[in-house]
């Protein structure tokens, strides 16, 4: 065993299956011979794999040299590779198509809702003949109509530092009309008038307008916190054994209803309110405006007047709330009063 050259020339056998090494047969056989260690022990590759699988050892039993194990090379035909690539592309395209189709379906649904809402708004403030002429223009029917509800929401909020969106919509309206009229000029000046109006109201009410909506919400929150504090104080004073389950359930339902109504009014109605009420208020108040104005011009002036009346009412109510804060009373338990 010490003379390696003599061992290789005389009788080289697989140390696992004891088959003799034949160089001619080795070139014809698919099972190649391996010499993975330093002690010149050779073996078939299949025999080595079987030995490693059965014993769980990856070292030579004689010299304890660790075998170098590598993944076999992939020997697939081009047809199999093409089928694999096609299967991967099919799965990927199915996922992408489903995602894109879902997004397009949701977008189309929202777009149709906004477009129908825009048509309803135009019917409230414009004549039918002028509306038919405007709908014949592709830019107006496909771009401007879906933007009208968004324009009303932006104009209703109307921060002085963000009027680009409203200006874009207004310019789209009169560019589709292919002429500059009094109505188009009035539409273009609405954001600037709203900004000046906001600044004027701020000067008049001396700080009441600034953060009025947030202050109103804070006052409502303080009101509810005061309400909860009194309820908690009452529950602490009362004896736990004398509480009735119906009363506790009533206060829980009242708290849940208040939270739900608060979320509904502040989130949903804040968006729906200007879209629905703004055109209707303009249509109603526009009837009382004298002069040779068109229906659309009267509707715009009436809507702006409704906005002014709304702001005056809200700011006046907030000023009154500041001077006369609300107070809440929780009545005592009638049973406890009679016992005392």
Curated annotation (Swiss-Prot):
<keyword id="KW-1133">Transmembrane helix</keyword>
<feature type="binding site">
    <location>
        <position position="44"/>
    </location>
    <ligand>
        <name>Zn(2+) 1</name>
    </ligand>
</feature>
<dbReference type="InterPro" id="IPR013083">
    <property type="entry name" value="Znf_RING/FYVE/PHD"/>
</dbReference>
<feature type="binding site">
    <location>
        <position position="14"/>
    </location>
    <ligand>
        <name>Zn(2+) 1</name>
    </ligand>
</feature>
<feature type="zinc finger region" description="RING-CH-type">
    <location>
        <begin position="6"/>
        <end position="70"/>
    </location>
</feature>
<dbReference type="InterPro" id="IPR011016">
    <property type="entry name" value="Znf_RING-CH"/>
</dbReference>
<feature type="binding site">
    <location>
        <position position="60"/>
    </location>
    <ligand>
        <name>Zn(2+) 2</name>
    </ligand>
</feature>
<feature type="binding site">
    <location>
        <position position="47"/>
    </location>
    <ligand>
        <name>Zn(2+) 1</name>
    </ligand>
</feature>
<feature type="transmembrane region" description="Helical">
    <location>
        <begin position="300"/>
        <end position="320"/>
    </location>
</feature>
<feature type="binding site">
    <location>
        <position position="17"/>
    </location>
    <ligand>
        <name>Zn(2+) 1</name>
    </ligand>
</feature>
<dbReference type="GO" id="GO:0005741">
    <property type="term" value="C:mitochondrial outer membrane"/>
</dbReference>
<dbReference type="Pfam" id="PF12906">
    <property type="entry name" value="RINGv"/>
</dbReference>
<keyword id="KW-0479">Metal-binding</keyword>
<dbReference type="GO" id="GO:0008270">
    <property type="term" value="F:zinc ion binding"/>
</dbReference>
<keyword id="KW-0862">Zinc</keyword>
<dbReference type="GO" id="GO:0090141">
    <property type="term" value="P:positive regulation of mitochondrial fission"/>
</dbReference>
<protein>
    <recommendedName>
        <fullName>Uncharacterized RING finger protein C32F12.07c</fullName>
    </recommendedName>
</protein>
<dbReference type="GO" id="GO:0061630">
    <property type="term" value="F:ubiquitin protein ligase activity"/>
</dbReference>
<feature type="binding site">
    <location>
        <position position="37"/>
    </location>
    <ligand>
        <name>Zn(2+) 2</name>
    </ligand>
</feature>
<feature type="binding site">
    <location>
        <position position="39"/>
    </location>
    <ligand>
        <name>Zn(2+) 2</name>
    </ligand>
</feature>
<dbReference type="GO" id="GO:0000209">
    <property type="term" value="P:protein polyubiquitination"/>
</dbReference>
<feature type="transmembrane region" description="Helical">
    <location>
        <begin position="249"/>
        <end position="269"/>
    </location>
</feature>
<keyword id="KW-0863">Zinc-finger</keyword>
<feature type="binding site">
    <location>
        <position position="63"/>
    </location>
    <ligand>
        <name>Zn(2+) 2</name>
    </ligand>
</feature>
<keyword id="KW-0812">Transmembrane</keyword>
<keyword id="KW-0472">Membrane</keyword>
<feature type="transmembrane region" description="Helical">
    <location>
        <begin position="274"/>
        <end position="294"/>
    </location>
</feature>
<dbReference type="GO" id="GO:0090140">
    <property type="term" value="P:regulation of mitochondrial fission"/>
</dbReference>
């Amino acid at each position: 065993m010490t003379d390696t050259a003599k061992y290789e020339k005389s009788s080289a056998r697989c140390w696992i299956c004891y088959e003799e090494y034949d160089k001619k047969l080795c070139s014809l056989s698919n099972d190649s011979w391996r010499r993975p260690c330093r002690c010149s022990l050779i073996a078939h590759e299949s025999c080595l794999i079987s030995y490693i699988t059965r014993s769980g050892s990856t070292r030579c039993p004689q010299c304890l040299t660790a075998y170098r194990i590598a993944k076999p090379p992939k020997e697939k035909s081009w047809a199999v590779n093409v089928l694999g690539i096609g299967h991967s592309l099919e799965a990927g395209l199915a996922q992408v198509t489903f995602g894109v189709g879902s997004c397009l379906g949701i977008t189309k649904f929202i777009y149709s809702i906004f477009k129908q809402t825009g048509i309803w708004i135009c019917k409230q403030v414009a004549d039918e003949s002028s509306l038919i002429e405007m709908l014949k223009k592709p830019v107006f029917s496909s771009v401007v109509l879906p933007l009208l509800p968004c324009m009303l929401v932006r104009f209703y909020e109307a921060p002085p530092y963000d009027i680009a969106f409203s200006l874009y919509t207004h310019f789209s309206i009169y560019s589709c009309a292919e002429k500059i009229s009094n109505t188009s000029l009035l539409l273009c000046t609405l954001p600037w008038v709203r900004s000046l109006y906001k600044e004027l109201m701020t000067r008049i009410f001396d700080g009441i307008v600034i953060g009025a909506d947030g202050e109103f919400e804070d006052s409502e929150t303080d009101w509810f916190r005061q309400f909860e504090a009194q309820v908690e104080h009452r529950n602490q004073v009362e004896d736990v054994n004398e509480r009735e389950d119906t009363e506790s359930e009533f206060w829980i339902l009242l708290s849940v209803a208040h939270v739900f109504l608060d979320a509904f009014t502040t989130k949903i109605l804040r968006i729906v309110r200007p879209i629905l009420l703004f055109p209707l208020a303009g249509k109603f108040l526009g009837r009382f405006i004298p002069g040779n104005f068109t229906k659309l011009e009267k509707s715009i002036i009436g809507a702006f007047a409704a906005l002014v009346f709304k702001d005056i009412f809200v700011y006046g109510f907030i000023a009154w709330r500041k001077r006369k804060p609300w107070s809440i009373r929780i009545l005592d338990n009638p049973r406890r009063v009679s016992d005392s």
